[in-house]
Amino acid sequence: MANKKNAPRKRRVKKNIEAGVAHIHSTFNNTLVMITDPNGNAVAWSSAGSLGFKGSRKSTPFAAQMAAEAAGKEAMEHGMKSIEVAVKGPGSGREAAIRSLQATGLEVTAIRDVTPVPHNGSRPPKRRRV
């Protein structure tokens, strides 16, 4: 078995992709931002947890903003200029992530809500009593 330290590391290849899709998955606990090419191959990704936010701080709009900013900058290194945004989930970081992607310099051409809606599927979790 090859040692992790001695294993040859793959170099990141700079792809020239003009347009892409930003998938924002916003849950109650975290926000994940993945930027793909039009075929769905990942170009860049980031999440609130991967940036060092822990616990309840991951679910804040600020954490979502930082995650979107990091993914946007990484995608721009690959030559990306315009993106469509697909938002999924009920979390608090949805709008903050979209605004942050626009602020990095990426042109947002469309915003879609792709939150899955059950056709009376499984029973939802019980209501919280705080």
Curated annotation (Swiss-Prot):
GO annotations of cellular component type: ribonucleoprotein complex; ribosome
Keyword Ribonucleoprotein (UniProt): yes
A Pfam family reported for this protein in Swiss-Prot or TrEMBL: Ribosomal_S11
Keywords: Ribonucleoprotein, Ribosomal protein, RNA-binding, rRNA-binding
GO molecular function, one term: rRNA binding
Entry-linked InterPro entries: Ribosomal_uS11, Ribosomal_uS11_bac-type, Ribosomal_uS11_CS, Ribosomal_uS11_sf
Presence of the UniProt keyword Transit peptide in the record: no
GO biological process, any: translation
Domain of life of the native organism: Bacteria
Entries under HAMAP family matching the protein: Ribosomal_uS11
Function as written in the Swiss-Prot or TrEMBL entry: Located on the platform of the 30S subunit, it bridges several disparate RNA helices of the 16S rRNA. Forms part of the Shine-Dalgarno cleft in the 70S ribosome.
Subunit-level organization: Part of the 30S ribosomal subunit. Interacts with proteins S7 and S18. Binds to IF-3.
Family classification: Belongs to the universal ribosomal protein uS11 family.
UniProt protein name: Small ribosomal subunit protein uS11
